[in-house]
């Protein structure tokens, strides 16, 4: 049945996408097989350092081409990543649309590295990025054909989610500490 047993989707992803990034290629990944292997966890890559630098430069100077006193502009920092020999993507140029291009670049470059959650909150773009999510639902029809049904699910988002609430016990310890907005 094309690899589908009709069993519940235990451990499956609701989007239908699976992760290969940072996976040990020597692991055997077949149905009903669990594999464990030791590997180092990457906390920060040099790519993230360049992206953080680009964001800081753009936010400080308001100009993606301004190197300031640091010798590298926001565009140049992003282009270090885009010009890697194994990638060779078109360069970032100019200010027009830099923020949107940068946000996409960061999403793609750091995919599955645990940064998106924090990035979207720092940019205060949760309502734009997290309110709707596309979900893939796979089923077999009566003839054994795989049917894909894409559904957009709406989730709740409130601006207060950009900041965590401060525990009440901490506020009680320090009377000068104020709760984050709307908590």
Predicted features, each with a name:
Residues 1-183:
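Acidic/polar-rich alpha-helix caps and helix-coil junctions
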């Amino acid at each position: 049945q094309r690899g589908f047993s009709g069993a519940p989707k235990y451990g499956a992803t609701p989007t239908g996408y699976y992760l290969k990034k940072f996976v040990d290629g020597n692991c055997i990944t077949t149905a009903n097989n669990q594999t464990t292997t030791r590997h180092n966890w990457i906390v920060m890559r040099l790519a993230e350092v360049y992206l953080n630098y680009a964001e800081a430069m753009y936010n400080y100077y308001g100009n993606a081409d301004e190197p300031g006193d640091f010798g590298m502009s926001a565009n140049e920092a992003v282009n270090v990543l885009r010009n890697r020999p194994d990638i060779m993507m078109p360069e970032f140029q100019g200010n027009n649309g830099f923020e949107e291009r940068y946000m996409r670049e960061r999403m793609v470059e750091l995919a599955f590295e645990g940064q998106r959650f924090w990035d979207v909150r720092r940019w205060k773009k949760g309502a734009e990025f997290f309110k709707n999510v596309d979900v893939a639902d796979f089923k077999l029809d009566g003839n054994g054909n795989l049917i894909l049904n894409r559904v957009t699910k709406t989730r709740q988002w409130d601006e207060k989610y950009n900041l965590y609430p401060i525990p009440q016990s901490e506020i009680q310890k320090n009377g000068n500490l104020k709760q984050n907005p709307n908590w």
